[in-house]
């Protein structure tokens, strides 16, 4: 059974034991008069059950933290190395997130599993914001979703605008070839003027930066080049061979998209594992604090029960000798 399944099981086990009523004190006379024989030890039994469940949950969260740390170390170096793939495109084409186009495709990258803080909610929030920002009578925004968590949120209010849904992307370690095939499939199945890739850029275990990378279609690149600016510098390059400018821009757009996607997937995976490490560490500390409070409650309850029994024994002995 996976760690997440075990955590859910312990949560269900602990849920019936958590209630708004305080644990009855064994010193309460009314409860002692009305309770059946042996009911005086029920308070300590409830606390012991809670302590057992909290200990089990703490073991699971610590194990999940260690697993996330191991996965993060495996991905982090690859993510840092992949940054060199898309940076030349930024130097050549610039980053034009504010370019005005009619057909926008938002590629939202999320995780398939939860318990990783708010990275998925952040990506979905930005994706919805891009949809509203690029809305208009002559404009349309479509979504390409990577990951179960973004799918579950975006499908509620944007189902008709979702073009492609891809899940279990992180099930096996990804390489550039696999991501480039995925990028080609996306380009073949959507019509776009601009692709907006939404992901979380890894900075540290406790920090990630929500990021939007823009990839323009060859037609929009030509239009922006004619208008001047950063893309206007493309006209200064000489074209060698028999390829036309349109063909070169088409190949450039496809290669740029696959490089940006590869980096985005790895960066988001790093952010996911870092956020999961942080969340599980916080959960483990909270479980430890709860365990300390339950231990104190258990000792007090047990001491009160023993004191009550001693009082009864002494009272009975006094009655016999009196």
Language model segments and positions:
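C-terminal beta-strand-loop-alpha-helix "lid" module of Rossmann-like NAD(P)-dependent dehydrogenases
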Residues: 2-322
